[in-house]
Amino acid sequence: MHLQRNFFILIFFFISFLLWKTWQQKEFSSDVHKIINKYENVNLVNNNINKLASNIIIKTDVLKIQVNLYGGDIEKAELLHFKSKLNSSQSLVLLDTNENFVYQAQCGITGKDGADNLQKHIRPLYIAKRKYYELSRHNKKIEVPLQWISKDGIIYKKIFVLKSGEYDVSVKYKINNITNKHLKVSMFGQLKQTINLPEDKNTYTNNFALQTFRGAAYSSDNDKYVKYSFDSIVNKEKKNIVVTHSGWVAMLQKYFATSWIPDNSYLNTMYIGSSGDNLAEIGYYSRPIDIFPHSTISLSSKLWIGPEIQNKMAVIASNLDLTVDYGWLWFLSQPLFKLLNFLYNICGNWGVSIILITFIIKGITFPLTKSQFKTMAKIRKLQPKINYIKKKFKNNNQKISEEIMSLYKTEKVNPLGGCFPLFIQMPIFLALYYMLISSVELRHAPFFLWIHDLSDQDPFYVLPILMGVTMFFIQRVTPSNVTDPVQKKIMNYIPILFTVFFLWFPSGLVLYYLISNLVTIIQQKIIIKALNKTLK
């Protein structure tokens, strides 16, 4: 009885969690649509300024970026190895600039004698030798120099360096002070993005799937990873958040990120906030840097534009790999992903890797499963005595509970022992869920036949239905201590309820649960057979 009650409590919390997430997403979606309508007629791009300048294109084998010569900002970035949608011929556009949506990576030289003044909308108008640059197959990197000369004759060179197969962009500055003046400048980098997405970029789905984090984040000397949702930034004035040598600022979304990594040779101030035209901003500026008369200095920073590939991001900057947001169960999701990635390197298929990791998890938890069935068998053996206690004290529920607990203590039976494995599986299940919906490696990753994307739902619902069948079979062959007909009826509906929920879950997660159920059936037969021999 206690075992079944604990099981129902577990099911209650699981269903409550899913319903809460769904309600939260519906509220979020409603708010988003309201704010989108408010801003839909706002022109987010200053067309008068942009008409004065032209753009240049820089292309490698993995990146294609568009740089506006007015300021030298990156206004568009395509990830050539990632498609916008499954089976689409169009590359994914991460950074973009149009009338309804802005997502830019800005950088420059500001300060008392700098070329850039964002507050007054003053930017240098750079010149380039040509409009299109492409990395050849025989070269490992490409350098694209831009140049601007101030009215005082100070020469500013802004150089973009892109490498073959890499998503980090180096931005270098060479400032030649030919004057007799002592200059003070600061280097800055900023990311800005439309807070509320227009309809064509809103990936919200109205089902039970959990939504991943979208917002801004930073890392510093003292904090490895701090994040801000866009909801917490909207209508907030810019404020300095930390002064640090090391670290980065970033904007995050599902599977992809952009991040400025400043030069840690200088002390940098990081800031965050929003402007009045529906834009969130996060960035940094360095402490004032001296440029003496008739001298040249070199400055640099790095920009990550691409997928959240953890091992590559960790090389670019310390803690940058933490932008892969696994939620509150990150301490389980991270080792699970490392194990899954290790298995993938062996077998070359993410679906097979999920099957293998299921075998490993079920093998590790087998002692708990065995303990669960032992506890259930002991409780069934005590059922006649429990029924006698209920009959003897039928008008005194408190006495019944006391006598049953006394019986468990005498017989050395822990009624919670049968439910413990269920509680162990829940965090593993959720950790695997967050891993599957947050790891870019599984985006559009095929398994076999009709499963072309393990991070998305099964298009034909075959896996959820099979999972429901295995769950129903487990329920039928598992010896039960339930005697109440109402509870029995409710138990019969549990597989159906779970099948409905799993229809919209990532197919990789449903595959895990299906294989887990199949392994459970085999383990169950082995354990029950051994217990029957022991209890004879």
UniProtKB/Swiss-Prot annotation:
<keyword id="KW-1003">Cell membrane</keyword>
<feature type="transmembrane region" description="Helical">
    <location>
        <begin position="417"/>
        <end position="437"/>
    </location>
</feature>
<dbReference type="InterPro" id="IPR001708">
    <property type="entry name" value="YidC/ALB3/OXA1/COX18"/>
</dbReference>
<keyword id="KW-0472">Membrane</keyword>
<keyword id="KW-0813">Transport</keyword>
<feature type="transmembrane region" description="Helical">
    <location>
        <begin position="3"/>
        <end position="23"/>
    </location>
</feature>
<dbReference type="GO" id="GO:0032977">
    <property type="term" value="F:membrane insertase activity"/>
</dbReference>
<keyword id="KW-0653">Protein transport</keyword>
<dbReference type="Pfam" id="PF02096">
    <property type="entry name" value="60KD_IMP"/>
</dbReference>
<dbReference type="GO" id="GO:0005886">
    <property type="term" value="C:plasma membrane"/>
</dbReference>
<comment type="similarity">
    <text>Belongs to the OXA1/ALB3/YidC family. Type 1 subfamily.</text>
</comment>
<protein>
    <recommendedName>
        <fullName>Membrane protein insertase YidC</fullName>
    </recommendedName>
</protein>
<feature type="transmembrane region" description="Helical">
    <location>
        <begin position="454"/>
        <end position="474"/>
    </location>
</feature>
<dbReference type="GO" id="GO:0015031">
    <property type="term" value="P:protein transport"/>
</dbReference>
<dbReference type="GO" id="GO:0051205">
    <property type="term" value="P:protein insertion into membrane"/>
</dbReference>
<dbReference type="InterPro" id="IPR047196">
    <property type="entry name" value="YidC_ALB_C"/>
</dbReference>
<dbReference type="InterPro" id="IPR019998">
    <property type="entry name" value="Membr_insert_YidC"/>
</dbReference>
<keyword id="KW-1133">Transmembrane helix</keyword>
<feature type="transmembrane region" description="Helical">
    <location>
        <begin position="346"/>
        <end position="366"/>
    </location>
</feature>
<keyword id="KW-0143">Chaperone</keyword>
<comment type="function">
    <text>Required for the insertion and/or proper folding and/or complex formation of integral membrane proteins into the membrane. Involved in integration of membrane proteins that insert both dependently and independently of the Sec translocase complex, as well as at least some lipoproteins. Aids folding of multispanning membrane proteins.</text>
</comment>
<feature type="transmembrane region" description="Helical">
    <location>
        <begin position="494"/>
        <end position="514"/>
    </location>
</feature>
<dbReference type="InterPro" id="IPR038221">
    <property type="entry name" value="YidC_periplasmic_sf"/>
</dbReference>
<dbReference type="InterPro" id="IPR028055">
    <property type="entry name" value="YidC/Oxa/ALB_C"/>
</dbReference>
<comment type="subunit">
    <text>Interacts with the Sec translocase complex via SecD. Specifically interacts with transmembrane segments of nascent integral membrane proteins during membrane integration.</text>
</comment>
<dbReference type="Pfam" id="PF14849">
    <property type="entry name" value="YidC_periplas"/>
</dbReference>
<keyword id="KW-0812">Transmembrane</keyword>
<dbReference type="InterPro" id="IPR028053">
    <property type="entry name" value="Membr_insert_YidC_N"/>
</dbReference>
